[in-house]
Amino acid sequence: LGEAPEILAEGNEMGNKNSGGHSGGQYRPLKPEQIERIHQAALSILENIGFTYEQGLDDTLTMLEDAGAKIDHAHSRIYFPPDLILSQIANAPQQVILYSRDAQNDIDLRDDRVYMGTGGMAVTVVDIETGQARESCLQDIYNIGRIVDRLDNIHFYLRPCTAHDVPASIYDANCMYAAMQATNKHYMTGAIDRQSFRDILTLASIVAGNEKKLAEKPIFSLITCFAISPLKLCTQSTLNMQEACRHRIPVALSSAPMAGSTSPMTMAGTLAQLHAEELVGLTIGQLTHPGAPMLYGGIPGSANMRTMGYQGGAVEFGMMNAAIHQLAAHINVPNYNSSGLTDAKIPDAQAGWEKAFSSLLAAMGGSNYIHHAAGMLESMLAVAYEQYIIDDEIIGMCARVLEGIIVDDEHLAIEAIADVGPGGNYLMSPHTLAHMRSEFFAGNGITDGRFRDIWVADGSLDTRERAQEMAQKILERDPCFKLDKRTEKRIRNDFDIRM
C-alpha cells in the first residue's frame, strides 16, 4: 500500500485508456425557455443590427446577397433575415468525426459526447529546465505533441503554441509536420492565409495517402477566427473557412467575445452576441458548400475590469462554456468550446482549482470538443510541458465523473456481500480483484497517495516537480510514432521544413 505507482512515462497499467466519448449533460446552466430566448435575441441582432465586414470579401458578399441577405455597401453592413439563417443551419451535419491516423483516437462529435484536448497559440513556454518563460518555438510543438501522444486522457492535439523561429510563408506547413511527426491523434490547426491552407492540405494529403483519402477521413481540421467580436467578419479567416468547406475539411468556427470589452458585461448578452456570430459563420459555410462539417465554436470569456486583461480563470468562464453546448445543441450542431484556462503563471494551486472547475463544468455540460483543457497558463499566453501531465489527470477525473455509477447485479455485489458475511473484509474477495482496476480512477501516477515517510524518502517532490520528471522521461523515450521515410522524404522535397 505504501509503494509509489508506476508513472505513466514508464507504462501504467492502471491508467484509464480511451477516456473520451462519455456522455455529459448533467449540468445545464440554461433552462429551455432561456435557450430559446437567447436564440431569438441572436436572430433579432442579425436582422436588425447586422454584421460589418472588412474589405476583400466581394465574392462572399455576392453569395450572401444572392441568398437573400441585405447588404448596405455604403456602411459595410450585412443584415440576415431569420429565414436565411434557419434554412442554412439546417444543412449543417449533426455529427462530425475527426479522424486519427491509427483509428484508435477517432473523435465522434455528436449529442452530449465529450472529448478534451489541447489548444492555444501561446507565445511563451515555461521552460522545464529553468522554470522561466521563454519564446516558444517549433521544437516545442513537436515535444508537446510527443507528451500528448502518451497521455490517454488528452484526446486530440490542437497546435498549442507559436513557432517564433519559423517564417510566415512556411509557418503552417512546418507546424503540421512537427505535430504529425509527434502523434497519431487528430490535429487541429489554423492557417495564415489561403496559400498556407493549400500547403497544409497538400501536406496532409501526402500523409493520408492522397487528397481523396484525406477527404474521406480528414486527419486534420481547421480553426478559423472568422468573427472579430463584436459582429465583424475577418476577411482572411472567412476565406480560409470557405476554402476548408469546399474541401470538406472540418471547420471550428471560433468566436471569442470578452464580456465587458468585446461583448456586453452580462453573460446573457455575451451569449446572445456570440450565438449571432456563430449563426453567421454556419450560414456562410453552408452556403459555400452544403453539408460541410462544421463545429459551433463559441469561446465566451470576460475581461478583468481591474486590468482589462483576459480573465481566464473565472468561474463564469466554465458556466458560459457549458451554456455554449446547449445553444449548439438547440440548432443540432456539434460544438467546440473551451475549459482549463487559468490566470496562474506557473503550475500551482491556483492553476489547479481554476482548471478543474472550468473543465468539470464544460464536461458535465456535454460539450463535444473542449480545447484549452490541457497545458495552458497565464490566460492562454503560456504553456508548460509539466502542465500537460497534471491536466491529463484532471481530465481523467472529469471523464470518471461522466462515466457515473453503474448499478446492476454485478456492481450491487449481493453475492460478494453474502460470501464475505458480517464482520469479514473484502481485501481478498474475487469481486474486489475483478473491479479494483476499473471502479475507481487510478490516474497517470501524478497524484501522490503514498505515506509521508515514503514520500520524504523519495525526495519530497511536489506535484510540479513530479510532473516535470514524468514529462522529461516521456521525451527521453523513443517516440511512439514517426512518419515513414518515404512520406517524410516527399514532404521535405515539397516543403521547406525547418525541424
Language model features: what each stretch is:
Residues 1-13:
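Short, Lys/Arg-enriched N-terminal segments with co-localized hydrophobic residues
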Residues 56-58, 62-128:
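Glycine-rich, N-terminal phosphate-binding loop and its surrounding beta-alpha-beta segment
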Residues 132-364, 368:
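Helix-rich catalytic cores of soluble enzyme domains
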Residues 300, 320-343, 368-376, 383-411:
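A glycine- and small/hydrophobic-rich beta-loop-beta segment
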Residues 15-18, 28-41, 49-66, 386-499:
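Catalytic-core signal marking the mid-to-C-terminal active-site face
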Residues 35-37, 41-44, 108-130, 330-342:
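N-terminal small/glycine-rich loop or linker at the start of catalytic domains
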Residues 51-61, 73-75, 155-158, 214-217, ...:
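Flexible, glycine/charged-enriched surface loops at secondary-structure junctions
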Residues 23-27, 306-312, 340-347, 375-387:
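Short beta-alpha connecting loops at secondary-structure transitions
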